[in-house]
Amino acid sequence: MATKCKNEKLQMNYIYIYEGALPKYIKNSLENTLKIDPDANIYFCNDQSYQHENITSVQIESIISKSTKNILHKEFFKYEPNLLWTRSLNRIFYLRDVVNTLNINKFVHFDADVLIYKPFNEINYKFSSSKFNITPLSEKEIIFGYSCSLNRENFNCIVNKIEEFLIEFTDNESKNLLSKDLNEMKILMKIYNNEPSLFNLLPVVPKEISDEVFDPASYGQYLGGTKDRFSKKFTDENHLPGKMIREGFIRPKIYNSYPKIVFNNNEFELINLHVHSKKIKKFLPK
């Protein structure tokens, strides 16, 4: 069980992954991570020849394994109009390939529209050193709002199980798959339900074990809205934090440019904010 205590001091490796033309918000997120955790290593796996003097840019094509190529060949979600679903699934395999190619054993990874507010070594929450630490979104979904692996072998095991599951789809089934039926968040939950011992689900609502909370997506959606659809104060009752926000048990707020939540008159720090609206600049810490 996780306890409230400092993690071992590490020079953490942050790994970003993105396919396609780079929106401004990704660059803002990268710059923020450099600012918040200046002693960390930052790797950006992309296909745009991105260059930054303080960030290691890794070309996706240079790290793709044969196993990943087999998954790409199946063209999951081919007929979905939004490339997000294909790219989000592919990202899991690129992440495996980059940590294995570069021999990275410990890393933090989150979606490209996430901001962090605390250096890894200042986080009080005790991450599991043997399991994959990641944010649950709902009873049916696990999301890369924030994830941390301190054990590459464990992470490889999870990705291998995802691969074993996906390889059973025929090429026709994979191409016609719809995101509403299956996506990377639901696949992660499926693997968790089959083998929960591989995962440590991070606290996304206030708990006694920690005065820190991680945002799967819910707090960012409440404070900043969702892309192209809803303004701020959006809640989804299916999200683990969403129902508590909607019922008034949790109140997210911004204080001195840092996100916090109030629960039972106690204030909890948000380690990260998943800004679904992509309005990253609005939430950059001063």
Identify the meaning behind each predicted range.
Residues K131-R152:
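Short beta-strand-to-loop element that shapes/binds the nucleotide-sugar donor at the catalytic cleft/hinge
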Residues N156-K286:
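Catalytic core and acceptor-binding pocket of nucleotide-sugar-dependent glycosyltransferases
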Residues R87-N133:
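GT-A fold catalytic core of metal-dependent nucleotide-sugar glycosyltransferases
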Residues M1-F77, N100, R152-E153, C157, ...:
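N-terminal anchoring/stem segment of glycosyltransferases
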Residues Q51-E53, I116-P119, N124, I142-F144:
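Short catalytic/ligand-binding loop motif for oxyanion handling, primarily in non-cytosolic enzymes
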Residues P23, W85-L89, D181:
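A conditional alpha-helix N-cap/helix-loop micro-motif detector
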Residues G20-L22, D47-S49, H109-V114, E139:
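An acidic- and aromatic-residue-enriched active-site/binding cleft used to recognize and process polar
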